């Protein structure tokens, strides 16, 4: 059994797998679901993660956070974030410069969390799901990210793992992980060109790989880190908001709860339209007492999302062009991600490849976690012979380079270069007697740096004065297996060296911030545990009170008790039930004391009955064990 897990940290749902008994086991959560909503909610008494958080979202929309993956590693001023904020019921604010933070009310206080912290809570839930199944503590994990995630987003995801106290052995790309799920059993077919089309809840990747004898080599990757099922939901929401306005002259945008109920109905309708030609929406008392009953056809849905669906083909063309392969040479087109169930997406893709049959052999929701679990087993040397000869050769999704005179982007590592990789180039000074150079590192494909993404900068100083062009400054770019960049610069004449892992310019968390967040996470976990114990002791008391009350109402049992005893039990159990209703937020100790007091009175009386029957004394038949159904 592997001691390392594979986690697919998704925009809308997450999934965890482990290598066990020579195969991957996808692990179900405490609700029995194999995928867990990437939701975290805060209320007056507790923090909820996963299904519990998503289930209460309509009641608590402003304090229920989702889509952290759409925020992670991005700037607050990013137009994408600004546009998303129109759809989010929770509050996003700028902190520490231009970094987005999420603001919620928790236990009556205003709290802010970074996207890394929220993601770490989801990771923690996946870690606990695996630990409950495996019966041991898990410290190591492989976490997946969209292939088109940039350096900042990868680093931030790694930080989220650290906050969840996970040693992130590797960050791997989602389509590459899915390719492992597809190719693990297919080792003897010679070289095959595979196109992975991965359209999920919030991100979209296309990767082209060749697979041969266990070697998975990515040739090219492209995508959109901001396209997925949620965008299709948004189109439906906007459509119905307009319809409601037309019919009832009222604006749903003014009410977050109504909007959330509508969004949930839209998501359900979208899923229905994958198998039916029409879906109905029925929401009672949606807004100001108005019931909203309507329907939508598949054709109308396809029209609403037409530009988004068509846009899915652009990255397909890009990877074909970058890998210099013709459509005809693609052996398999493999579908991954829940949104690939949409018939129109399948039809457009199939038409694009002249009617070629699409490969639907892998589970679109679980394939990524499956591949991550295989990689986790390999990195822990626990996969055995079955995975021994698997080799992953992935690529850098974006070109990396630095700014040279005139704001020109000089690329050191072109996009789709196999990683890990190292490239160096020698530069010189721009003016006479220049004693320092500013090294500014960018990623992107545009000719001028102003159109690309600044990753970070540093200064190399103390260069001996010399005419321009004389000093030799060697800059080295080193991308590790996680796709994260390290840069160093060295003045060859003095040996003066400056090395950085691209850090704070891109809003990365410092080691101190991560340390504080780890402590906070431990505190929240302890609070969660304490809250669970309170609920358990409350339920225990409630169960006991109701059980003894119903016991004495049983005619057979009542006949064996004196009137006084019956009255005592009835009064005491009613008293306990009334106390429970009046003290909804009592402490664990108070519930336990009330339980003790009630037992002290009722147990001896109930024992008399069982004593007369010659049966076993049920004693603490507070015994009604707390079942799942008892938990609100």
UniProtKB/Swiss-Prot annotation:
GO terms for molecular function: ATP binding; ATP hydrolysis activity; ATP-dependent protein folding chaperone; heat shock protein binding; protein folding chaperone. GO terms for cellular component: centrosome; cytoplasm; lipid droplet; phagocytic vesicle. The keyword Cytoplasm applies. One of its GO terms (biological process) is response to bacterium. The keyword Protease does not apply. It is found in: Cytoplasm, Cytoskeleton, Microtubule organizing center, Centrosome. Residues 609-632 are annotated as: Disordered. Gene3D superfamilies: 1.20.1270.10, 3.30.30.30, 3.30.420.40, Actin, Chain A, domain 4, Substrate Binding Domain Of DNAk, Chain A, domain 1. InterPro entries: ATPase_NBD (IPR043129), Heat_shock_70_CS (IPR018181), HSP70_C_sf (IPR029048), HSP70_peptide-bd_sf (IPR029047), Hsp_70_fam (IPR013126). Keywords: ATP-binding, Chaperone, Cytoplasm, Cytoskeleton, Nucleotide-binding, Stress response. May function in protein folding and assembly, and disassembly of protein complexes. NCBIfam families: PRK00290.1. Belongs to the heat shock protein 70 family. This is Heat shock cognate 70 kDa protein 2. It comes from Dictyostelium discoideum.
């Amino acid at each position: 059994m592997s001691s390392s897990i594979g986690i697919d940290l998704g925009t809308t749902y997450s999934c965890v797998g482990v290598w066990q008994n020579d195969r991957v086991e996808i692990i179900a959560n405490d609700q029995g679901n194999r995928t867990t909503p990437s939701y975290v909610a805060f209320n007056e008494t507790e923090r909820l993660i996963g299904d519990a958080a998503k289930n209460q979202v309509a009641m608590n929309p402003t304090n229920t956070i989702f889509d952290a993956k759409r925020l992670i590693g991005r700037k607050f001023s990013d137009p994408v974030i600004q546009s998303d904020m129109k759809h989010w019921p929770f509050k996003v604010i700028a902190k520490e410069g231009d970094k987005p933070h999420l603001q919620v009310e928790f236990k009556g206080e205003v709290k802010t969390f970074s996207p890394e912290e929220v993601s770490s809570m989801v990771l923690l839930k996946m870690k606990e799901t695996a630990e409950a199944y495996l019966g041991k503590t898990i410290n190591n994990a492989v976490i997946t990210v969209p292939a088109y995630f940039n350096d900042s987003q990868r680093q931030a995801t790694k930080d989220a793992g650290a906050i969840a106290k996970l040693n992130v052995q590797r960050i791997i790309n989602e389509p590459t992980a899915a390719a492992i799920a597809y190719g693990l059993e297919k080792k003897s077919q010679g070289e095959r060109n595979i196109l992975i089309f991965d359209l999920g809840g919030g991100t979209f990747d296309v990767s082209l790989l060749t697979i041969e004898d266990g070697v998975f080599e990515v040739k090219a990757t492209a995508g959109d880190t901001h396209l997925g099922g949620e965008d299709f939901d948004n189109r439906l929401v906007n459509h119905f908001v307009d319809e409601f306005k037309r019919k009832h002259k009222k604006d749903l945008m003014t009410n977050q709860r109504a909007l959330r109920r509508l969004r949930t109905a839209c998501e359900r309708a979208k899923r229905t339209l994958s198998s039916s030609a029409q879906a109905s929406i029925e929401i009672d008392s949606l807004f100001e007492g108005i019931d909203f009953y309507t329907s939508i056809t598949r054709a109308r849905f396809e029209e609403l999302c037409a530009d988004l669906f068509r846009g899915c083909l652009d990255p397909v063309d890009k990877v074909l062009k970058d890998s210099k392969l013709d459509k005809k040479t693609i052996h398999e087109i493999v579908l991954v991600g829940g949104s690939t169930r949409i018939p129109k997406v399948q039809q457009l893709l199939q038409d694009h490849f002249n009617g070629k049959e699409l490969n639907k052999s892998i589970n679109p929701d679980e394939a990524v976690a499956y591949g991550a679990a295989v990689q986790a087993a390999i990195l822990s040397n626990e996969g055995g012979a079955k995975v021994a000869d698997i080799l992953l050769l992935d690529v850098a999704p974006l070109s990396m380079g630095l700014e040279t005179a005139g704001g020109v982007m000089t690329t050191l590592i072109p996009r789709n270069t196999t990683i890990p990789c190292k490239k160096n180039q020698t530069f010189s000074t721009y003016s006479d007697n220049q004693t320092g150079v500013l090294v500014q590192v960018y990623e992107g494909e545009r000719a001028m740096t102003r159109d690309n993404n600044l990753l970070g900068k540093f200064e190399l100083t103390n260069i001996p004065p010399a005419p321009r062009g004389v000093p030799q400054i060697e800059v080295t770019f080193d991308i590790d297996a996680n796709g994260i960049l390290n840069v160093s610069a060295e003045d060859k004449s003095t040996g003066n060296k400056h090395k950085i892992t691209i850090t704070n310019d891109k809003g990365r968390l410092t080691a101190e911030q991560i340390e504080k967040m780890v402590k906070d996470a431990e505190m929240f976990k302890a609070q969660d545990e304490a809250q669970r114990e309170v609920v358990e002791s409350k339920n225990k008391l409630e169960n006991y009170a109701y059980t003894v009350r119903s016991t004495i109402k049983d005619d057979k049992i009542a006949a064996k008790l004196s009137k006084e005893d019956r009255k005592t039990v009835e009064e005491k159990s009613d008293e306990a039930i009334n106390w429970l209703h009046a003290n909804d937020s009592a402490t664990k100790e108070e519930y336990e004391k009330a339980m003790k007091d009630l037992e002290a009175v009722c147990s001896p009386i109930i024992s008399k009955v069982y004593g007369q029957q010659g049966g076993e004394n049920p004693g603490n038949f507070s015994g009604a064990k707390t079942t799942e159904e008892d938990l609100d």
